[in-house]
């Protein structure tokens, strides 16, 4: 029963996290936003997600580690779950060291104080968002397969 509950919580948390990342990728490409719209949208998203998303990432990573430990007698499932942890760590590190420093800068801007290179920072943020989203999608896929093979 423990394995089922950990797997359920793991799949739920990681799916919520990666789903949010995918939704941003799908619906919020800022490339064509005028400066005012970009700033309003980005600052709103940062305020709304900058605490919740990293918490979900940490919980999801810990649950995936727990799932791997519980699957330690099944080499394939354990290996898939460890690979999912690696993807989760990649997404987390990209977020922490690439996206969040840009977020911190954006939060200090007003329309009047946006730097002349704001589009460079916007494009860098977007590139790193795509990177972490792909890592998240691969990680979620590995988690799902690792969970399914473990159940067989």
What is each model feature region?
Residues 3-7, 13-59, 105-123:
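Interfacial loop at the N-terminal end of multi-pass membrane proteins
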Residues 146-152:
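Juxtamembrane boundary at the C-terminal end of a transmembrane helix
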């Amino acid at each position: 029963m423990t394995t089922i509950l950990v797997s359920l919580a793991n799949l739920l948390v990681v799916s919520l996290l990666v789903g949010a990342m995918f939704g941003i990728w799908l619906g919020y490409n800022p490339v064509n936003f005028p400066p005012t719209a970009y700033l309003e949208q980005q600052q709103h998203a940062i305020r709304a997600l900058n605490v919740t998303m990293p918490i979900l990432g940490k919980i999801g990573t810990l649950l995936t580690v727990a799932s791997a430990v519980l699957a330690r007698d099944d080499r394939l499932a354990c290996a898939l779950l460890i690979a999912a942890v690696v993807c989760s760590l990649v997404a987390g590190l990209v977020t922490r060291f690439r996206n969040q420093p840009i977020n911190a800068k954006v939060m200090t801007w007003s329309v009047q104080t946006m730097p002349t290179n704001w589009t460079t920072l916007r494009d860098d943020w977007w590139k790193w968002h795509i990177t972490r989203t792909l890592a998240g999608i691969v990680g979620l896929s590995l988690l799902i397969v690792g969970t399914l093979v473990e159940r067989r």
